[in-house]
Amino acid sequence: MNVLVVGGGGREHALCWALRRDAASAFSEDLTLFAAPGNPGTAALATNLPIPATAVDHLVAAALRHEIDVTIIGPEAPLAAGLADRLRKAGRTAFGPSAAAARLESSKAYSKEVMRRAGVPTAASATFVEETPMLDYIATHAEPVVVKASGLAAGKGAVVCKTRAEAAAVARAMLAGSLGEAGKEIVIEEFLEGEELSVLALTDGERLVILPPAQDHKRLGEGDTGPNTGGMGAYCPVGIATTSLLARVRAEVFEPVLREVAAQGSPYEGVLYAGLMILPDGTPSVLEFNARFGDPETQVLLPALLPGFSEHLVAIAQRRWNPLATQQMLSVERAAVTTVLAARGYPDNPEKGAAIRLPDPAELGDDVIVFHAGTYRDNEGKLRASGGRVLSVTGLGQTVALAAHASRAAAERIAFEGKTWRRDVAWREIQRAGAA
């Protein structure tokens, strides 16, 4: 079987890692793995193809040339650009939603409208494309104010503003082009307090299976301070994700949204990620939808699961999925914590080119996996940072606390100039365990 993973980040390295791990037991034939564009981490597991993840025409041509059986699309941009549609039209099989269904992520305004029509709990909001009515709305809004670019902004398009004045300035800048096309439409939203939870579901458009939830750490600094990022760490399992809560998430979030997009003629196929705020009264409220696996959530979810999970992604793509079989293998084998190591200046102006000293895997131990994201090799073969989020360091353990210790100990041993990271990933779960 020939499989292509599209993307070059930590999520895609984790997907390649899982596919390679599962190859012997889950697939009935030999696995030939490709990544486009991949990174130095995927190069050890797959053949990297030097094709950008957004080069749809070239990716389709590569899928035909290499006789790819299944393409697993990692990032949001190629989904929004219609890569899954184009592959299917060319007679290839793809894991990922159509461009129309992927609007749940690529347009926050559309996502809000879908939730309104489906009766899904979410923060009150209003959408604007013109400055004057937007500023008038902000002027009477309760503080804090959440300002979101409607389009794709690499996880950095949502800003929690303490004051109306700050919100007005941020919204005006977005509308003026600070985030490019992503900010041409602005969503102004009420601020919700509670605890965030990342819940992902596999679906073929009709049936769904909820995966073990994770908790992301969006803020750059320890203690959840600083600007929003694409994610500075994550952990799994999460204590607040009880069976009863997940039953509510299924009934109140996933099922009505899937029905609504199907009714609009855009059935959703692939993985749907619900970024939730669990309110103090236990109500799950949707902050956002993503049309793909989360990053860095994937880097904890896949190592935590029993081997064999990736075959179920292939089964969905090939329209032969058995949800019951997926549900039966979803027990979390071990806790997992990933710590993201970012470049200095991230997220606004990350530095590039720092040389990375990465110990051999044997030195880090069997309970640590390092996933590459923003890395490359120079002309001499030296590993360097290409900016942004550079590495995800995943630790495994019988408890979240032990997994966090393994992750942090390994992160300490990885060196590059300007290394920026949080030493408190999973602090809520560790605090909960200590209070129990």
Q: Can you say where each PLM-predicted feature lies in the sequence?
A:
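Solvent-exposed alpha-helices and their adjacent loops that cap or buttress functional pockets
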Residues: 26-27, 41-42, 65, 95, ...
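Generic C-terminus detector
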Residues: 375-380, 384-436
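Active-site "cap" helix and flanking loop/linker of ATP-utilizing ligase/carboxylase catalytic domains
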Residues: 250-272, 290-367, 378
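A conserved helix-loop-beta module that forms one wall/lid of the active-site cleft
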Residues: 95-157
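Short acidic-hydrophobic, aromatic-tinged amphipathic segments that line or gate anion-handling sites
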Residues: 48-55, 126-130, 161
